[in-house]
UniProtKB/Swiss-Prot annotation:
Location(s) in or outside the cell: Membrane
Family the UniProt entry places it in: Belongs to the cytochrome P450 family.
Cellular component terms (Gene Ontology): membrane
Name of encoding gene: CYP52A3-A
Organism: Candida maltosa (Yeast)
Induction of the gene: By alkanes.
Descriptive protein name: Cytochrome P450 52A3-A
Gene Ontology molecular-function annotations: heme binding; iron ion binding; oxidoreductase activity, acting on paired donors, with incorporation or reduction of molecular oxygen, reduced flavin or flavoprotein as one donor, and incorporation of one atom of oxygen
Amino acid sequence: MAIEQIIEEVLPYLTKWYTILFGAAVTYFLSIALRNKFYEYKLKCENPVYFEDAGLFGIPALIDIIKVRKAGQLADYTDTTFDKYPNLSSYMTVAGVLKIVFTVDPENIKAVLATQFNDFALGARHAHFDPLLGDGIFTLDGEGWKLSRAMLRPQFAREQIAHVKALEPHVQILAKQIKLNKGKTFDLQELFFRFTVDTATEFLFGESVHSLYDEKLGIPAPNDIPGRENFAEAFNTSQHYLATRTYSQIFYWLTNPKEFRDCNAKVHKLAQYFVNTALNATEKEVEEKSKGGYVFLYELVKQTRDPKVLQDQLLNIMVAGRDTTAGLLSFAMFELARNPKIWNKLREEVEVNFGLGDEARVDEISFETLKKCEYLKAVLNETLRMYPSVPINFRTATRDTTLPRGGGKDGNSPIFVPKGSSVVYSVYKTHRLKQFYGEDAYEFRPERWFEPSTRKLGWAYLPFNGGPRICLGQQFALTEASYVIARLAQMFEHLESKDETYPPNKCIHLTMNHNEGVFISAK
């Protein structure tokens, strides 16, 4: 067949739109690949090992992630993926055409969060979270984030977080709920989530939703505020959907069911009620409210009168202030119920400092005196090590950049990270690395925090993130958790775990908690 005849037969197909589109796509991706290779060579970088189970466009891996997350095993799944590469701390995978570097190396995490902070951003997080949280400190990048942080930082000054006395009325109701189940098996986590939504709404709005109140206590929940009665449940459901949107990455828009939209509306309704109340208050009423005790919203109103800014920032802080503390308390009590020796040792420390039972000196528990409880601090450190509030996080490269380690077969070369690529980092796994925590890294042992090896961990211990975006409310959460555990130690001598699964299945929404609840008995 003559060459002219071949050209004559093939030419019509070459001019078809789909052929042109295919050729353009191939050319585009080939040019990107060649460009990346050039920069890898220029910057003396090497690719990390490719995750062999990712499959075509990462779709099989994404399906696996959805399955294990539903089963409460996502954190442990990401942990075990590194078992395939025992000498490496990073690997590469893909989601569609998106390149993803997965790392547990403290040096890489430090680069992403601190030393190369301006090379990375939240990426699509704003789109993922926007339906519930809007434009707040956890969803914004750049100038918007800087303005949010400047606005919120004063609200977490020492005098605010030191005011533990406001917690006591809520602790009393929590204790009554526990005593209702004396000698019985009950879900303590469910009570902690109700407790922290009560304390968080009082701190933020100036009035608690009192979700711990119920008919069993003879204290019916008040129903005088629109949306109060179903706020906590709606907030939980909305966060579940936000997490699904996050793990769906570029397919987040597929998660937008009616239930999600309805729950968002319920949450917004309550927040808007409090915002409007604050905005309609006179200057004198605002000052009077502030004198009665610190109220986050009324302090914020002194800085801005924009109702959307107020609503969005309140809900952003609600996520952190409520869920991280509830998760920390739940995991701490889960381990304490499993380890009676640790519980007894903790109670001995509380007895020395504040007394127990009928001899409890509750008035002596303060921000300052809680600092004396070194073993309590070690228990919380160990809880946050094994169960960090945000076990897995990610950032997106805003420009072509590098990570210091993880490339090549030995994992010691820099990694080239093209603009638009994601870096996923697992603090959950980093906190279990034996080179930092020893052979018993998977065991709950508070005593490790009195050993020299844990005094120079640096970026290998990161319970509250790090760098410019380090958690503003970390001391607030630690103070609240310390107070609650100290009070429970005063009131309950014996704890017994009723959970048979260990390690526990973990539910990861925006933060982490027990997938099935924390079932114990207490007396």
